[in-house]
């Protein structure tokens, strides 16, 4: 710990003692005063230069004596020069004139966004950025886009609305934090599906594969996904309708009105997603010892999904705060519980989530150069599981007597309640080439299970024993960027606090009698933990950059792991946080004109991670419970190549290899028993997968200024074992092996009506292959999708219905 304090002091001292002259201000468009992101401002004849951020702000070190010439330039704008006399710190705002109307409408906004993405890619973190502009109007879902990204694999258990796990460098599930605009997405009851987020509202997606930025709270074990949404502050009307196989329908309606004079922004949005998910599957599933004649095709009839989302927002832009937003969202869903062993028809889950929230942002808060962001949201959740069926319909049509359709063979009719308060407070202070960032992320959760039928099994009313959790994460980071942006260094320190009070309301289900002694006991856990990370980024040669980072991360158990679900999962009273040590080495090449190609981008990462206290779900009596495992070790690499062959042809290929093994040699029992799975591959995680594809896009093929795109994507996942391979017999190994698969997807897009409308067609799983990503969880076959998108923006800079 002393070494950490010493390192912190050494890194922060230059900030305190630096004596330099600074030129600072904003770079804006002359006509509209819109901030220009990615504009270059430089001292002519020197290496001193910098880029403006997304708010148009810049800071530049300038000579202390004499006069110097400032040059300001940005793609699509006329170059500006000014002679400035040296002296003290100077504040200057620069206004650039568009070089032409077409550039202003087509090039400028995209180039500014590209500059912002490049700044993220050059940071010391191991990060991949997916440009949302290229996804606009496509029929693909967010999960489908992510699973084609290097180092990432999304594991789905079914169609729309089914459970899924996002894997980043072998870390998956809740170890990968998911954010929207830097705020945790993970819904408290786990009901929110990432695919419910419309792909057209995405600005870009950041995928962090090691260090997680301090402003996101760092609540991930070395992996995080941040979905950055578009903020088009102008009048707009949008409508999207998508139809797909298996009864899938997605509808999105949105509208926004900007009152310029008072600076008031009002917006509303609604989406509805539903699907029957009634695709065919082979039955019995994964019974490899049966003859071919024993298999038959059956239709899933209880895998339906429906979700509705309503949003209303009111924003103020001319108050003391630069951004003052009041928003409220209402989300509800319903999902059938599909069984693979019989033809389920009745069991289902449903949930309601009301989420009022407040967002405050202020630049130059209290002092010059200090930016403040504050967000608070109070989710109010109601979740239900209903399973009261007294019969079961078998796949052959016969009906048998039963107690429910779920695996626990108990009637369930839960009405659970959950209330949360989540807040995030962030301060960022920039002075010269140094940036300090202080982030505080707080979460409080109260969970009250209620089930009248479960009350009879337990012998007491579980709603009389609510559980509580309080968690807080404080992170402090320092970022240094050299004058020419060639070197960057990021140091982060984090403190985690957990306070949980949990009642063991499910313990009585393991008993055979009901007495007063079965009333649950409360267990309280209160602990603090620390984490840190250090990252370096250095430009070795022009367009070639190396990255090195190390992090010690902690993931605090979430409410679902601590509280259980009141039905099939017991509370985990002594659950410990997961701890991981990560080492990443990466290289980036981004060069134009290489070997006659328009642009070549290449990224590769080598990673090593040692993790302990891995949280896994295991059987416990008639229920399940989350428990901590020992140690696991991960070694791997991923590489990603993107090539713009010509202005119209684009190719990509990415590959991931990883080796994940159990490194717990001995069990922590009194006898010191040896672990039979020591040094064996951790099951149920793909070790080898790759993606490749090509795209042809052009402007003016069908109508002047209309855009066209044709593409093909291919995803391959190598075979992997679902369980520990303890046998050397080929027949036994085959029973637990998930086969490899190759999924081909083809699609086309066409814009219409001056790019205010787009039509998209996509065919997924072209060859209708039987596909598994989870054991005994077949995925849909060939799927046809059609999407119509209409978007009308008052501000043409906001873009059209699709983009190249």
Task: List each language-model region with its residue ranges.
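A beta-strand signature from Gram-negative outer-membrane beta-barrel systems
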Residues: 94, 199-238
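Short, acidic, small-residue-rich periplasmic hinge/interaction motif at the N-terminus
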Residues: 28-32, 40-44, 73-77, 87-136, ...
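Gram-negative outer-membrane beta-barrel transporters
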Residues: 601, 605-610, 627-721, 798, ...
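Periplasmic-side early beta-strands and strand-to-turn transitions of outer-membrane beta-barrels
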Residues: 242, 260-347
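Short acidic/polar hinge/loop motifs at secondary-structure boundaries
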Residues: 58-61, 183-210
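Extracytoplasmic beta-strand/coil segments of soluble accessory domains associated
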Residues: 127, 138, 143-184, 203
């Amino acid at each position: 710990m002393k070494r950490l304090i010493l390192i912190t002091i050494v890194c922060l001292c230059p900030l305190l003692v630096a004596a330099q002259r600074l030129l600072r201000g904003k770079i804006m468009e002359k006509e509209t005063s819109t901030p220009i992101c990615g504009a270059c401002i430089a001292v002519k004849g020197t290496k001193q230069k910098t880029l403006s951020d997304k708010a148009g702000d810049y800071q530049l070190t300038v000579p202390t004596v004499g006069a110097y010439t400032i040059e300001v330039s940005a793609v699509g704008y006329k170059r500006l020069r000014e002679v400035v006399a040296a002296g003290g710190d100077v504040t200057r705002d620069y206004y650039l004139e568009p070089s032409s109307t077409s550039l202003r409408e087509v090039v400028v906004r995209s180039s500014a966004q590209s500059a912002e993405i490049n700044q993220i890619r050059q940071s010391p973190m191991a990060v991949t950025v997916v440009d949302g502009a290229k996804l606009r109007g496509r029929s693909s879902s967010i999960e489908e886009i992510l699973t084609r990204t290097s180092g990432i694999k999304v594991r789905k258990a079914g169609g729309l609305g089914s459970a899924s796990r996002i894997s980043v460098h072998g870390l998956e599930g809740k170890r990968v934090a998911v954010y929207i605009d830097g705020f945790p997405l993970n819904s408290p009851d786990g009901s929110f599906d990432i695919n419910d987020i419309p792909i057209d509202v995405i600005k870009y997606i950041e995928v962090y594969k090691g260090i997680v930025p301090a402003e996101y709270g760092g609540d991930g074990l070395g992996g995080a996904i941040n979905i950055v949404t578009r903020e088009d502050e102008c009048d707009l009307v949008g409508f999207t309708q998508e139809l797909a196989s298996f009864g899938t329908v997605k509808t999105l309606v949105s509208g926004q009105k900007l009152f310029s004079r008072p600076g008031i922004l009002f917006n509303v949005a609604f989406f509805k997603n539903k699907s029957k998910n009634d695709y065919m599957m082979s039955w019995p599933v994964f019974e490899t010892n049966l003859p071919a004649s024993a298999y038959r095709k059956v239709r899933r009839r209880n895998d339906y999904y429906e979700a509705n989302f309503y949003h209303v927002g009111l924003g103020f832009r001319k108050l003391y705060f630069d951004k003052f937003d009041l928003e409220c969202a209402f989300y509800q869903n319903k999902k059938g519980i599909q069984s693979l062993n019989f033809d389920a028809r009745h069991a289902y889950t449903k949930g309601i989530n009301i989420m009022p929230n407040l967002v405050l942002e202020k630049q130059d808060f209290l002092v010059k150069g200090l930016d403040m962001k504050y967000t608070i949201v109070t989710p109010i959740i109601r979740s239900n599981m209903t399973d009261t069926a007294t019969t079961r319909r078998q796949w052959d049509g016969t009906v048998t007597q039963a107690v429910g359709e779920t695996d626990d063979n108990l009637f369930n009719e839960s009405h659970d309640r959950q209330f949360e308060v989540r807040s995030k407070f962030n301060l960022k202070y920039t002075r010269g080439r140094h940036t300090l960032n202080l982030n505080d992320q707080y979460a409080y959760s109260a969970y009250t299970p209620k089930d009248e039928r479960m009350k009879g099994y337990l012998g007491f009313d579980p709603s009389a024993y609510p559980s509580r959790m309080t968690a807080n994460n404080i992170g402090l980071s320092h970022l240094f960027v050299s004058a020419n942006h060639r070197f960057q260094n990021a140091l982060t320190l984090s403190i985690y606090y957990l306070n949980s009070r949990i009642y063991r309301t499910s313990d009585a289900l393991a008993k055979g009698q009901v007495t007063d002694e079965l009333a649950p006991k409360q267990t309280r856990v209160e602990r603090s933990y620390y984490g840190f990370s250090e990252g370096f980024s250095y430009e070795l040669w022009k367009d070639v950059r190396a990255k090195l980072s190390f992090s010690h991360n902690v993931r605090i158990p979430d409410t679902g792991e601590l509280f259980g679900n009141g039905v099939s999962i017991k509370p985990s009273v002594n659950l410990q946080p997961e701890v991981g040590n990560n080492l990443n080495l990466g290289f980036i090449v981004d060069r134009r004109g290489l070997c006659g190609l328009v642009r070549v981008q290449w990224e590769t990462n080598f990673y090593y991670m040692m993790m302990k206290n891995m949280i896994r779900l295991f059987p416990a009596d008639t229920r399940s419970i989350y428990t901590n495992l020992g140690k696991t070790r991960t070694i791997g690499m991923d590489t990603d190549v993107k090539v713009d062959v010509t202005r119209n042809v684009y190719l990509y290929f990415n590959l991931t290899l990883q080796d994940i093994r159990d490194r717990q040699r001995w069990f922590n029992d009194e006898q010191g028993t040896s672990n039979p799975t020591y040094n064996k591959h951790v099951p149920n995680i793909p070790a080898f997968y790759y993606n490749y594809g090509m795209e042809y896009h052009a402007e003016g093929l069908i109508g002047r200024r209309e855009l066209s795109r044709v593409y093909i994507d291919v995803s391959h996942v190598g075979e992997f074992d679902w369980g520990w391979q303890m046998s050397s017999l080929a027949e036994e190994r085959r029973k637990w092996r998930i086969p490899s698969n190759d999924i081909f997807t083809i699609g086309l897009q066409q814009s219409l009506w001056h790019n205010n409308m787009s039509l998209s067609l996509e065919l997924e799983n072209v060859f209708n292959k039987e596909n598994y990503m989870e054991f005994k969880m077949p995925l849909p076959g060939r799927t046809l999708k059609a999407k119509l998108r209409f978007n009308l923006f008052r501000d043409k800079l906001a873009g059209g219905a699709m983009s190249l």
